[in-house]
Amino acid sequence: MLVLCGLLPVAVSAKTLDEQYPAPWIKADNPSITRAFSEADIDGCGKYRYRVSSGSKSEFLVYCTHGGRVTQAFMVWPNIHKLMGPYPPDPSLP
């Protein structure tokens, strides 16, 4: 796995990133995620796709996109106003 996995709580659970955040990618806007980016003054993530954690429906792996290309990754917990990143996207996730 890429550096992203080493920096995330995923490493503790011994699950792969794909198991922790199973497909599919959701491409629709999520007001909670959008608000979390706004509150954290994150630029460059106006368009994104995300996966919901298998362990918590309020935890998301978010990939920011620009021009159809993934540029950066974040962990987002909107319910507790927490955001971690940016991280490089993991190329093993389709």
Question: What is each residue range found by the language model?
Answer:
Residues 75-94:
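A short, surface-exposed interaction/processing loop segment used at functional sites
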Residues 44-76:
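Exposed beta-strand-loop-beta-strand "reactive/processing" segments of non-cytosolic proteins
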Residues 8-13, 43, 83:
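N-terminal processing/targeting junctions
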